[in-house]
């Protein structure tokens, strides 16, 4: 679904923008927003890794049953819930058991490694940059989307999508394997690039 949306958006919005800008400027915009998406995603990922690393290191230095609750909430979906609950119940009955403590430290290291090795593939950040450009250059163009039964102006569509990406990025729900801040990075860099270009030329379609 995510890939289909990207391909559809690239065709729908990209073809209009390429006709407006021309192939050269379109490619410049596409690559810059793609790089901007990667930059913001990398920055956010490094911050998240640092946060997890600090918590894990604190736990490894002073492991305990109570402290493990805080730790496993970081990425509890890494392990089977039933298996984890069984382990916690057993450990609760014998909190000084060194084998349980050692196993909890292994879980802590696994959480950190999982955070360090999260793969990221795709160019959807650049696609969201195109979506932002469409909304800025053709703000009052009506869009008819399958999942929205009424026509909606491009500027409002972009605002809604941007707000949803920000909410989902901040929420960081378990199992959500979408790089929301990459999408926001593409939109952010696209916004500043269009503002820069419009200093010399102001064209807005309606």
Predicted segment positions?
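A detector for small-residue-rich transmembrane helices and their helix-helix packing motifs
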Residues: 1-206
């Amino acid at each position: 679904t995510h890939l289909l949306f990207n391909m559809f958006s690239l065709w729908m919005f990209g073809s209009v923008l390429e006709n407006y800008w021309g192939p050269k400027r379109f490619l410049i915009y596409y690559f810059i927003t793609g790089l901007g998406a990667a930059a913001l995603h990398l920055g956010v990922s490094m911050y998240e890794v640092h946060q997890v690393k600090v918590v894990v290191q604190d736990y490894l230095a002073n492991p305990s049953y109570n402290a493990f609750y805080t730790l496993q909430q970081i990425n509890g979906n890494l392990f089977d819930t039933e298996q984890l609950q069984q382990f916690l119940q057993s450990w609760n009955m014998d909190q000084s058991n060194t084998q349980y403590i050692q196993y909890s430290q292994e879980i802590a290291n696994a959480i950190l490694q999982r955070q360090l090795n999260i793969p990221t593939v795709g160019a959807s950040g650049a696609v969201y940059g195109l979506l932002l450009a469409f909304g800025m250059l053709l703000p009052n163009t009506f869009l008819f989307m399958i999942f929205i039964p009424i026509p909606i102006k491009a500027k409002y569509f972009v605002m809604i999508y941007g707000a949803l990406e920000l909410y989902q990025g901040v929420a960081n729900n378990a199992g959500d394997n979408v790089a929301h801040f990459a999408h926001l990075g593409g939109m952010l860099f696209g916004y500043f690039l269009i503002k820069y270009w419009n200093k010399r030329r102001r064209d807005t379609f309606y």
